[in-house]
Amino acid sequence: MDRQVKGILGAKLGMTQVWDNNRVVPVTVVQAGPCVVSQVRSQEKDGYAAVQLAYGAIDPRKVKKPISGHYAKADVAPRRHIVELRTTDAGEYSSGQEVTVEEFPAGISVDVTGKTKGKGYAGPMKRHGFHGLRASHGVERKHRSPGSIGGCATPGRVFKGTRMAGRMGGVRYTVQNLTVQAVDTENNLLLVRGAIPGPKGALVLVRTAAKAKKGGAAK
């Protein structure tokens, strides 16, 4: 469904807490932007309306020629990261325009996308929350094993998607319907209520919520 989307790239700085009406609220601090518009796509030319946002300083010598030419066409200095957001109001943007945290007033609902912390190879108890086998009474050195993964003759195979040990974390993940607690326009900071994916310093994308609750921000 077509809708207007506001977005900004930033870095996760960490978590802290603030007071709101005598209640302690846990928040994540995001160093958001400023981003710059590197391209505007239109329905007539590209078949869809979208805006490209670029973020993060980078040495121009490290940018490959095709990407460098893309930025030069927009008369914008090369950036380290780029993202494209589909939005019906893309025509209101122009190449070189700066996007800041002022796009996100306090109280608005947002979706935050990032890459989760990589945990490496993990067993089924840590990866999937299995309770493990009994601590005693017949269990011998198999306390953290997953147990049976299938029958011998029926079905005679392991079903696809069976939860097992394996690499955990390090995947793209979106947390929906978080509330912007406060905005610091001078320092380009967003205080988002709750936790967001990734370690400190991780790249995150903050955009207006796709499933915002009716009647205002999510509680």
From Swiss-Prot:
PANTHER family: 50S RIBOSOMAL PROTEIN L3 (PTHR11229), LARGE RIBOSOMAL SUBUNIT PROTEIN UL3C (PTHR11229:SF16). The keyword Ribonucleoprotein applies. Keywords: Ribonucleoprotein, Ribosomal protein, RNA-binding, rRNA-binding. Part of the 50S ribosomal subunit. Forms a cluster with proteins L14 and L19. Disulfide bonds: none annotated. GO terms for cellular component: cytosolic large ribosomal subunit. NCBIfam families: L3_bact. It comes from the Bacteria. Belongs to the universal ribosomal protein uL3 family. InterPro entries: Ribosomal_uL3 (IPR000597), Ribosomal_uL3_bac/org-type (IPR019927), Ribosomal_uL3_CS (IPR019926), Transl_B-barrel_sf (IPR009000). One of the primary rRNA binding proteins, it binds directly near the 3'-end of the 23S rRNA, where it nucleates assembly of the 50S subunit. PROSITE patterns: RIBOSOMAL_L3. One of its GO terms (biological process) is translation. One of its GO terms (molecular function) is structural constituent of ribosome. It holds the Pfam family Ribosomal_L3. The lineage of its organism: Bacteria, Bacillati, Actinomycetota, Actinomycetes, Micromonosporales. This is Large ribosomal subunit protein uL3.
